[in-house]
Swiss-Prot record:
GO molecular function, one term: catalytic activity
Activity regulation (record text): Exists in an autoinhibited state in the absence of substrate protein, due to interactions of the leucine-rich repeat domain with the catalytic domain. Is activated upon binding to a substrate protein.
LRR repeats: 223-242, 243-264, 265-282, 283-302, 303-324, 325-342, 343-364, 365-382, 383-404, 405-422, 423-445, 446-466
GO cellular component terms, semicolon-separated: extracellular region; host cell cytoplasm; host cell plasma membrane; membrane
EC class of the enzyme, as a word: transferase
UniProt domain comment: The LRR (leucine-rich repeat) domain is involved in autoinhibition of the enzyme activity by interacting with the catalytic domain.
Alphabetized Pfam families for the sequence: NEL
Protein name (Swiss-Prot/TrEMBL): E3 ubiquitin-protein ligase SspH2
Substrates-to-products reaction catalysed: S-ubiquitinyl-[E2 ubiquitin-conjugating enzyme]-L-cysteine + [acceptor protein]-L-lysine = [E2 ubiquitin-conjugating enzyme]-L-cysteine + N(6)-ubiquitinyl-[acceptor protein]-L-lysine
Gene name of this polypeptide: sspH2
Organism: Salmonella typhimurium (strain LT2 / SGSC1412 / ATCC 700720)
Subcellular localization: Secreted; Host cytoplasm; Host apical cell membrane
């Protein structure tokens, strides 16, 4: 009986019904062989195994010796443990492959010879296929002469034909997997499994993220419509499947893209060094290409609705399609914008070099254009709800739309405000030149927050605000402002001169302590820290606390010895001097807190665990006080947040043992914090410490650093277990929740279960850490508050 030889092409998947139809149609010999070997495979693998047997017996166009090896290796992979030893390649030489029964009798074999013959022997029947030498694409040879080089391929179809069967796909994928560098082999194996599942299940979504890949195989499943490739190391992509509708590639190393499928609807390429784009499909609706290195864009498709080109190097934009609804182009080098489509609803062009904006469409409801060079704004659409134009050069604003909900105009040159819409919920005019305010401000809702900090408001205006907001029944907005108004600009001294005023003079013959601060003056934010030191000398602590100067001198001595701590402290100084002296004091507290944590992480308390726990307790108490202060701020109508935070810290310094806090502040009387508030806060902090501190310190980063140094083996074992717990939980959630719901490959769903898996693994890690913490810290955790 001759072999049942057809076209050599089978569908991408074969149902059980199709298997039996093939098996009972004149029973070709490979099916007789199948009856003898199907028990080698579990029921879930039998379909794929039969597909592979069929392909071995009917080699498709382009078959190479490597393909034959891959097909027999695939059968070994699919077989039950133990039965894979019955599937051989190279038993009688490198060109002989066979499958044996339980008595070691041959069921099926394939032999290749140097003449280019591919011979299949199966149950007494033999069929030879003629192979050709692939010397050039599309060229066929008639044999393999001795000494010739090249690859034998079957000669039925051109060698460039794409895979048609799962076995053909698997051959290509397996070869790609075996060619992996050592560090990439695990990732490629995982991706091959995903592609097999995608092909066998008919899943239209393929996600191959975070696998450490530098390449992809030459062929991807042809049927997929969504391809997601986040966080690998790809420098290029293979030819894309023709039916693709959505392509998302983030966090790779792509500098260019292949030809895009004509039916592509959504293209998202972000966080790559991409320098240019190919021609875009005419039906493209969504183009997100932010975080690349693009300097220009191609012609945009007429039906494009969303365009995100933020974080590139664009100096201009092409003509915008009439259907465009959303345009995000922040952080580029744009100096102007083209005409905006009439239906545009969202426009984000912040962090550019725009000196003006074009006419705004009537449908626009969101406009973000902060950090540009705008000196004026065009007329605003009546339906605009968000206007974010901070960090420009505006001296005035146009009439504000009645629907406006959010207005951010900080860091401009405004001297006055127009009438404010009654429905406004957020107003930030931080750092402008306002001396007075519109009457409409006090008529805003009680749900509205207003930030007036950094403006030179007149004393008359401040007094009026105090009277209005403190009146019985006041139901207007919450207003934040500077108690002493904005500080006037002042000259910044050289850092070593500012430091010298605080440092102890040198003894005779010794170098001046301030000398080494000469070189620190070249570091980032040194000017800000110099100004901060000068402002410290104007605070209540300098005036009233005789030991304050010595404290600062000691602090500066540590900063001089620690580059990392100095860099963090200098950076914090940039926000410390923008208003009143209490702000300077508050930021000093923040800097001292950073110092405490830094010392713990560096190992200062490795041999003084009591001091480590004491530092942790102080951080816990300060954190609780901050929560209490934030709640208090919400109850005040006219408030300087700094004064509220500082009031709790300053007045509870002694009762809560806050070593990083100073003893004086200037504006406590107008902070809004009462004696009752302070008493309640003290009780709340102490109660919270008693019930929560053991769990809190278990999660404290500096404690982890100490444990890693003192018990590295135990901590490392717990870290490794945390990683394996995460992977196991993620797989379980994927199998039990995503797969049944058809959400495998859905980025949002996978991110959600990833967060749950991470949280579960973290809890297990902390549970494992608890005995070590109890063992090492012991009684230090049992310290109780003394009765007053």
């Amino acid at each position: 009986m001759p072999f049942h030889i057809g076209s050599g092409c089978l569908p991408a998947t074969i149902s059980n019904r199709r298997i039996y139809r093939i098996a009972w149609s004149d029973t070709p010999p490979e099916m007789s062989s199948w009856e003898k070997m199907k028990e080698f495979f579990c029921s879930t693998h039998q379909t794929e195994a039969l597909e592979c047997i069929w392909t071995i017996c009917h080699p498709p166009a382009g078959t190479t010796r490597e393909d034959v090896i891959n097909r027999f290796e695939l059968l070994r992979t699919l077989a039950y443990a133990g039965w894979e030893e019955s599937i051989h390649s190279g038993q009688h030489g490198e060109n002989y492959f066979c499958i044996l029964d339980e008595d070691s009798q041959e069921i099926l074999s394939v032999t290749l010879d140097d003449a280019g013959n591919y011979t299949v022997n199966c149950q007494g029947y033999s069929e030879t296929h003629r192979l050709t030498l692939d010397t050039a694409q599309g060229e066929e040879g008639t044999g393999h002469a001795e000494g010739a080089s090249g690859t034998f391929r079957t000669s039925f179809l051109p060698a460039t034909t794409a895979p048609q069967t799962p076995a053909e796909y698997d051959a290509v994928w397996s070869a790609w997997r075996r060619a992996a560098p050592a560090e990439e082999s695990r990732g490629r194996a995982a991706v091959v499994q995903k592609m097999r599942a995608c092909l066998n299940n008919g899943n239209a979504v393929l996600n191959v993220g975070e696998s450490g890949l530098t390449t992809l195989p030459d062929c991807l499943p042809a049927h997929i419509t969504t391809l997601v490739i986040p966080d690998n190391n790809l420098t290029s992509l293979p030819a894309l499947p023709p039916e693709l509708r959505t392509l998302e590639v983030s966090g790779n190393q792509l500098t260019s893209l292949p030809v895009l499928p004509p039916g592509l609807l959504e293209l998202s390429i972000f966080s790559n060094p991409l320098t240019h784009l190919p021609a875009l499909p005419s039906g493209l609706c969504k183009l997100w290409i932010f975080g690349n290195q693009l300097t220009s864009l191609p012609v945009l498709p007429p039906g494009l609705q969303e365009l995100s080109v933020s974080d590139n190097q664009l100096a201009s934009l092409p003509a915008l399609p009439s259907e465009l609804c959303k345009l995000w182009a922040y952080n580029n080098q744009l100096t102007s914008l083209p005409m905006l489509p009439s239906g545009l609803q969202e426009l984000s062009v912040s962090d550019n070099q725009l000196a003006s904006l074009p006419t705004l469409p009537s449908e626009l409801y969101k406009l973000w254009a902060y950090n540009n060079r705008l000196t004026s704004l065009p007329a605003l659409p009546s339906g605009l709800k968000e206007l974010i134009v901070s960090g420009n050069r505006l001296t005035s604003l146009p009439v504000l739309p009645s629907e406006l909900k959010e207005l951010m105009v900080s860091g401009n040159r405004l001297t006055s405000l127009p009438m404010l819409p009654s429905g406004l919920l957020s107003l930030s005019v931080y750092r402008n030149q306002l001396t007075r305010l519109p009457e409409s401000l006090i008529h805003l809702s009680s749900e509205t927050t207003v930030n007036l900090e950094g403006n030179p408001l007149s004393e008359r205006t401040l007094q009026a605000l105090r009277e209005i907001t403190s009146a019985p029944g006041y139901s207007g907005p919450i207003i934040r402002f500077d108690m002493a108004g904005a500080s006037a600009p002042r000259e910044t001294r050289a850092l070593h001169l500012a430091a010298a005023d605080w440092l102890v003079p040198a003894r005779e013959g010794e170098p001046a302590p301030a000398d080494r601060w000469h070189m620190f003056g070249q570091e980032d934010n040194a000017d800000a820290f110099s100004l901060f030191l000068d402002r410290l000398s104007e605070t209540e602590n300098f005036i009233k606390d005789a030991g304050f100067k010595a404290q600062i001198s000691s602090w500066l001595a540590q900063l001089a010895e620690d580059e990392a701590l100095r860099a963090n402290t200098f950076a914090m100084a940039t926000e410390a001097t923008s208003s009143c002296e209490d702000r300077v004091t508050f930021f000093l507290h923040q800097m001292k807190n950073v110092q405490l944590v830094h010392n713990a992480e560096k190992g200062q308390y490795d041999n003084d665990l009591a001091a480590l726990v004491a530092t942790g307790r102080e951080m816990f108490r300060l954190g609780k006080l901050e929560q209490i202060a934030r709640e208090k701020v919400r109850t005040l109508a006219l408030v300087d947040e700094i004064e509220v935070w500082l009031a709790y810290q300053n007045k509870l310094k002694k009762s809560l043992g806050l070593t990083s806090v100073t003893s004086e502040m200037r504006f406590f009387d107008v902070s809004g914090v009462t004696v009752t508030d302070l008493q309640d806060a003290e009780l709340q902090v102490k109660a919270a410490e008693k019930s929560e501190f053991r769990e809190w310190i278990l999660q404290w980063g500096p404690l982890h650093r100490v444990l890693e140094r003192k018990a590295p083996e135990r901590v490392n074992a717990l870290r490794e277990k945390q990683i394996s717990d995460y992977e196991e939980t993620y797989r379980m959630l994927s199998d039990t929740e995503l797969r049944p719901s058809g959400l495998v490959g859905n980025t949002d769903a996978e991110r959600t279960i990833g967060a749950r898996a991470m949280e579960s693994a973290k809890k297990t890690f902390l549970d494992g850490l608890r005995p070590l913490v109890e063992e090492m810290l012991g009684s230090y955790l049992n310290v109780q508050w003394r009765r007053n």
